[in-house]
Amino acid sequence: MAHSFQLGFQDATSPIMEELLHFHDHTLMIVFLISSLVLYIITLMLTTKLTHTSTMDAQEVETVWTILPAIILILIALPSLRILYLMDEINTPSLTVKTMGHQWYWSYEYTDYEDLNFDSYMIPTADLKPGELRLLEVDNRVVLPMELPIRMLISSEDVLHSWAVPSLGLKTDAIPGRLNQATLMSTRPGLYYGQCSEICGSNHSFMPIVLELVPLKHFENWSTSMI
């Protein structure tokens, strides 16, 4: 999860988030090289007193600065498209959970079970127990099995919301009248926090998301106790 004065991303908990971190590093390296080259050229032009006669009108230079950006864009686009397809629909999810955004809480329905659904509200600061996180704890956590592909169906009952869990690389808009889809798979157990990431009204900051990823046996025991 995030902490004070954090400069980087949260630790990756899913294969998709690991891919996104690698893509971020790849893109940042390209940006750094471009910036260094531009600064070098600017410095060179400002410090030299000589001017090459063909600098302002050279066919070779124009060819280079046309082809080079095209190559750079391809180097960025190819891994980006790969990740985009990896994030696309999975054919056989082990579990499907429907998420509905409300002003200002989330409701969840486990569609593979006959009657397993609940609302998830933020716990007020005055009711927090020692060690619990302010503005991030909820009364009902979303318990999910780890190391299994899970499909999230996301929509809204009222206004635009956005269901986001950074450590899993998830951010999907919740739009009234439209059902969006996201897939997740956690590589390790734990609690993973997120928040609504679309301004949705006065209490937008008070609708957190808490996922509890557990081994399959623990999930089966929990689901049995909830039905």
Curated annotation (Swiss-Prot):
Q: Cofactors per UniProt?
A: Cu cation
Going by the UniProt record, its keywords in alphabetical order are: Copper, Electron transport, Magnesium, Membrane, Metal-binding, Mitochondrion, Mitochondrion inner membrane, Respiratory chain, Translocase, Transmembrane, Transmembrane helix, Transport
One biological-process term from Gene Ontology? ATP synthesis coupled electron transport
Broadest EC class assigned to this enzyme: translocase
Q: Does the keyword Kinase apply?
A: no
Question: For side Mitochondrial matrix, which residue ranges?
Answer: 46-59
Q: Which residues cross the membrane?
A: 15-45, 60-87
**Subunit comment:** Component of the cytochrome c oxidase (complex IV, CIV), a multisubunit enzyme composed of 14 subunits. The complex is composed of a catalytic core of 3 subunits MT-CO1, MT-CO2 and MT-CO3, encoded in the mitochondrial DNA, and 11 supernumerary subunits COX4I, COX5A, COX5B, COX6A, COX6B, COX6C, COX7A, COX7B, COX7C, COX8 and NDUFA4, which are encoded in the nuclear genome.
PANTHER family this protein is in? Answer: CYTOCHROME C OXIDASE SUBUNIT 2, CYTOCHROME C OXIDASE, SUBUNIT II
**Protein name as annotated:** Cytochrome c oxidase subunit 2
UniProt lists the gene as MT-CO2
